[in-house]
Regions:
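Phosphate/pyrophosphate- and phosphate-bearing ligand-binding catalytic cores of soluble enzymes
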Residues: 2, 7-119, 126-156
Length: 156
């Protein structure tokens, strides 16, 4: 559905999908999709799903309070690598922390305010820019005001 409320049917090719990108207008809402899969042995599929879950449990803070991946990968680099290189692994501001386990995840330690999370993210962005010249782009959609400046719908 586009911004005017008109319904569209779009092919996969027209969507121009790439990493963290879709070629359609940002204000469109997707109401359904047809996904193509292939049949497989249920036991093998379950085994593979379990392997993926276990790998994530080792590498990501899946049991912590996070908003998921914080910054998009600045191709060809990986966000966690430039964050780590800038010395931000485990960085804590108020109740917010860059995960020591996977430093592209911000963790709410239990008492983080929106300001703590914003300040931590912006501090990481500044340190990464200073350390290696990379501009990290927020992957988390932020809504509201920060220090008197509207950030509704902005990616930073």
């Amino acid at each position: 559905i586009d911004g005017n409320g008109d319904l569209h049917t779009v092919t996969a090719k027209a969507m121009d999908m790439t990493y963290r990108h879709c070629g359609l207008p940002e204000d469109w809402i997707f109401t359904s999709a047809i996904l193509r899969g292939r049949p497989g042995d249920p036991a093998e599929i379950t085994k593979r799903m379990d392997e993926i879950h276990e790998a994530r449990a080792v590498s990501q803070p899946i049991k912590s309070r996070t908003g998921g991946s914080t910054f998009a990968n600045p191709l060809p680099d990986r966000a966690w690598e430039v964050i780590d290189a800038a010395g931000c692994r485990g960085l804590t501001i108020g109740g917010a922390q860059m995960s020591p386990q996977h430093c592209n995840f911000m963790i709410n330690l239990g008492n983080a305010t929106a300001f703590d999370l914003e300040e931590l993210g912006e501090t990481v962005r500044e340190r990464v820019k200073k350390h290696c010249g990379v501009d990290l782009r927020w992957e988390i959609r932020r809504i509201g005001d920060r220090l008197g400046h509207s950030i509704i719908g902005k990616d930073a």
